[in-house]
Amino acid sequence: MANIFEVPQPGNDLLEKADQVRLASIKISQTENHNRIKALNSMADCLEKSTKEILEANNEDYTRAQKKGISKALLSRLKLSKEKLNSGIEGVRKVGDLADPVNQVQIKRELAKGLILERKTVPIGVLGVIFESRPDAVMQISSLAIRSGNGVMLKGGSEANLTNTAIVKALKKGLYESGLDKNAICLLTSRKDSMSMLNLEKYINLIIPRGSNELVKFIQENTRIPVLGHADGICHLFIDNEANLEMALSVALDSKIQYPAACNAIETLLVHKDIAQVFLEKAIPLFNSNDVKLIGDKRTVELGVKYEASVEDWQTEYLDLILSIKIVDDLEEAINHIQKFSSKHTDGIITENSTSAKKFMNVVDSAGVFHNCSTRFADGFRYGFGAEIGISTQTLPPRGPVGLEGLVTYKYFLNGDGNIVDDFSSGKAIYTHKDL
């Protein structure tokens, strides 16, 4: 790992950029809600005006990436169509429609006469986001950062440098034209800078990596800055013996092929032995006709799956049109397999038995547990968050798709009238602890 990534100390240029973002984030944290909404609309306007420039930059990035032989999965994420760009721009505007996450009172309590405690949400500060390929992520991340009163330092994959630069140029112009500090958004373009970010604990409050398993794990192990993210997206779908067959086929297909490069696409399909033959005799030709390479255990091979799986296949995130299939004896075996190999991202069950569904959803320890629906719904936009900055598979919150609510923390505000603890110790004053 250390041979692939190194963590150099930040140079003066990076330190200056980080300080500019830090100072801008302080200003934005004090900005009124309506001004942050105004900024988002201005950012969207500038993106629209820069459509031609952005798409031309993306075409150049895509052509260069093809010549370098970049994988199909990364090429798919890199490509920015006009429709995808327009959708991203609309997403920036929709983030402005979401409720203000800042200055929300979570607790208001009278501790004693004249002593009032409040717990209120506040921006985190500066976000450091490292991601691969997807230039549309720049729009999502930046809009969520500004909406929640944070600054952001962005580092995308080098294959998208031209596209990301064009997008950030428009976003910064939008900030400036709205009256906010354009330095709240900063794009880094070198790998050295992205690794040096890990040593910016005096400037960055949260690192959000969105990339390969190897990159995410390295970041988690090599920074003192808190990290929000997931290293793998090994998602499962279990077809129970009491599943509706047509539903199972439809959901399984959507969960795999709707966008196979997504982290919420399934990598393993588990099938109850009592329904395996009737299900697979329809599923195998269905997946084959959609160019999905099927890999299975011995029992599935006997039923027509072409390639036999190894243990490695059960713990591989393909991000491609490849699917591992395993036949299990019962619900318990399905759950045990998931608990052993799942990355705790999203796992689902197809069944008409509500008791089985309830047990599956209560026992499987993943950020998302789904019943009778596609795993592809595990997404901040589809959850109604407006957009997501990432997905967290950690047990402590935030967990799952992270939108605005995951980009604020809280402070305790205590207002008194000369109150001192000694009065309570001596009995001169008493605590009332009354919620207001």
UniProtKB/Swiss-Prot annotation:
Catalyzes the NADPH-dependent reduction of L-glutamate 5-phosphate into L-glutamate 5-semialdehyde and phosphate. The product spontaneously undergoes cyclization to form 1-pyrroline-5-carboxylate. Pathway: Amino-acid biosynthesis; L-proline biosynthesis; L-glutamate 5-semialdehyde from L-glutamate: step 2/2. Pfam families: Aldedh. It is found in: Cytoplasm. PROSITE patterns: PROA. Belongs to the gamma-glutamyl phosphate reductase family. It catalyses: L-glutamate 5-semialdehyde + phosphate + NADP(+) = L-glutamyl 5-phosphate + NADPH + H(+). The lineage of its organism: Bacteria, Bacillati, Cyanobacteriota, Cyanophyceae, Synechococcales. Its EC number is 1.2.1.41. One of its GO terms (biological process) is L-proline biosynthetic process. InterPro entries: Ald_DH/histidinol_DH (IPR016161), Ald_DH_C (IPR016163), Ald_DH_N (IPR016162), Aldehyde_DH_dom (IPR015590), G-glutamylP_reductase_CS (IPR020593), Glu-5-SA_DH (IPR012134), GPR_dom (IPR000965). It is an enzyme of class 1 (oxidoreductase). GO terms for cellular component: cytoplasm. It comes from Prochlorococcus marinus (strain MIT 9312). Keywords: Amino-acid biosynthesis, Cytoplasm, NADP, Oxidoreductase, Proline biosynthesis. GO terms for molecular function: glutamate-5-semialdehyde dehydrogenase activity; NADP binding. NCBIfam families: PRK00197.1, proA. This is Gamma-glutamyl phosphate reductase.
